[in-house]
Structures are given as C-alpha cells and as structure tokens.
C-alpha cells in the first residue's frame, strides 16, 4: 500500500510540474506569480529526481548489485509470480 501511495505522490508531482510548465510557457502571468511557480517547479523537480534516484537504488538491490541497462523484453515470460 505504501508503494502505491508513493507512486501516486510521484504522479501527482509530475502532473503539477506539467501544469506549472504550461502556465509559464503561456507567458500571460505577472512576474511575481511566474517567479513563485518557478520556485515551486524547482522544488517538485528536485523531489522527483530524489524519488527516481531512490527507486533506481532499490532496483539495483533487487538485481543483487548487478547494474545493467533496463531491457523490457528481458525475463518477461508472462509469469507474474
């Protein structure tokens, strides 16, 4: 359950970050609002990078310390056990 919450939080952060990017790219905001959104976006980007780094480290642990490129076809035999 905790993993689903983290995933939802991550997805919400990305969605909010996209909203901020869209608003800033629109160019219709006052300067103060643009700066505030930019700062919020930086915080969201930093938090998202940290979450991705943590997930990457967890995956490395699952592969017994062996670091290799992700191959979506590798090991997918359709058995989800």
UniProtKB/Swiss-Prot annotation:
Substrates-to-products reaction catalysed: Exonucleolytic cleavage in either 5'- to 3'- or 3'- to 5'-direction to yield nucleoside 5'-phosphates
Location of this chain's protein in the cell: Cytoplasm
Keyword Lipoprotein in annotation: no
GO molecular function, one term: exodeoxyribonuclease VII activity
Main function: Bidirectionally degrades single-stranded DNA into large acid-insoluble oligonucleotides, which are then degraded further into small acid-soluble oligonucleotides.
Family membership: Belongs to the XseB family.
Protein name per its UniProtKB record: Exodeoxyribonuclease 7 small subunit
């Amino acid at each position: 359950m905790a993993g689903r919450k983290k995933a939802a939080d991550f997805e919400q952060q990305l969605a909010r970050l996209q909203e901020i990017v869209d608003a800033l790219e629109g160019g219709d905001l006052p300067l103060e609002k643009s700066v505030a959104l930019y700062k919020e976006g930086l915080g969201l980007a930093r938090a998202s990078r940290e979450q991705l780094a943590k997930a990457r480290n967890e995956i490395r642990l699952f592969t017994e310390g062996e670091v290799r490129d992700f191959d979506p076809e590798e090991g997918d035999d359709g058995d989800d056990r």
